[in-house]
Design a protein with these regions (language model features):
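A general secondary-structure boundary signal
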Residues: 7, 43, 51-54, 66, ...
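A short, flexible beta-alpha/helix-coil linker loop
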Residues: 73-75
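Minor-groove-contacting beta-hairpin "wing" of winged helix-turn-helix DNA-binding domains
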Residues: 31, 64-71
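Extreme N-terminal segment that seeds HTH/winged-HTH DNA-binding domains in transcriptional regulators
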Residues: 1-29, 33-37, 78-117
Length: 117
């Protein structure tokens, strides 16, 4: 269960879509109203998520419209930071389950699918 505020969850979903290139650099975002219907929340909640992404420079405002940033270097750095955050969260979770660092590393290596080797 995700205990974060709805606007943070929405911002996280959109960030994941941006960093995985499901949303492309320069692509126009859907309207606040359309996103509020999609996420089943109040438009103000979506607006807060969009404001957060603008502060992080993942979204750019042009007139009344929002676009995914075209700054590929920013996107590359953001993707690396998110990857590091996910690895850190994995290691913390493994530690909370009682695994040693060595055991966690071994399990991670064993879980790598052959197509990644």
């Amino acid at each position: 269960m995700d205990c974060r505020s709805f606007y943070l969850q929405i911002a996280g979903c959109i960030t994941a879509e941006i960093l995985s290139c499901q949303l492309r650099p320069g692509q126009q975002m859907q309207s606040i109203r359309r996103l509020s219907v999609q996420y089943r929340v109040n438009p103000h909640t979506v607006q807060r998520a969009m404001d957060k992404l603008k502060r992080e420079h993942l979204l750019e405002k042009c007139g009344q419209r929002l676009f995914i940033t075209s700054d590929r270097e920013l996107l590359r750095r953001s993707r690396q930071q998110e990857g590091a955050r996910l690895v850190g969260a994995f290691l913390e979770d493994m530690e909370s389950l009682g695994y040693t660092r060595t055991e966690a590393r071994q399990m991670a290596q064993q879980a790598v699918p052959p197509s990644w080797r």
